[in-house]
């Protein structure tokens, strides 16, 4: 029921009695699903920005709880962005932390400008062969400013540019992402096994779609009209059975490529 575009990661942690990482906060929405065992949580909507240095998490130097609860298997605790929390295991337990993407718009701006840099070219260089001597050498010349204005004004983007950028941005692999080893398989063998194999999107890979585009691994591709329905089904379920795939289809060709890139895994059925 949650859009994959919003899901960041799921982390599983084990703690012995008394185990904890210290009071900290995250800059995005988090659901904490309690697995086996139990844990005591203290939470606060306000916190000091004074952090313990050189820590992977934002560990607070001081923490004053505003509420607390004890959770057991199956309980879920929701934490809004920047809500500090401190969990201590009451017995051996597993906790599943489900994090959500919350793009920082200034970062989006920077990434979009990089995208535009790759998408657009402004050929040529400024020339002024008829330049005359000036008695104001510190002044930016009118023709130079006008030339830059005209060239920069040529950079325009469309709805499709924004859509493609958004899909590529949301499906980029995390810095610590480790892909599956490439599945080295000949095309002939792949096709011979197609009907008896299922294909699943690898757990750390995002596969999204919108309109005629698909997005995976930070790349956009256009989906033929005849293949859009089955691609959307694959993206929504993240699993497809080979008997539903035509051997000569765009989807079969795409899955063959994704196997070699570690985006999907094959499952014998």
Regions inferred by a protein language model and the residue ranges of each:
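Residue-level recognition of conserved beta-strand edge/terminus positions
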Residues: 78-80, 267
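Acidic, low-complexity/disordered tracts enriched in E/D and polar residues
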Residues: 155-234, 256, 267-269
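Long, charge-rich alpha-helical interaction segments
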Residues: 113-174
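Short amphipathic alpha-helical interaction segments
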Residues: 246-260
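Active-site region of the double-stranded beta-helix
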Residues: 1-75, 83-125, 130
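Short capping segments at the starts of secondary-structure elements
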Residues: 232-244
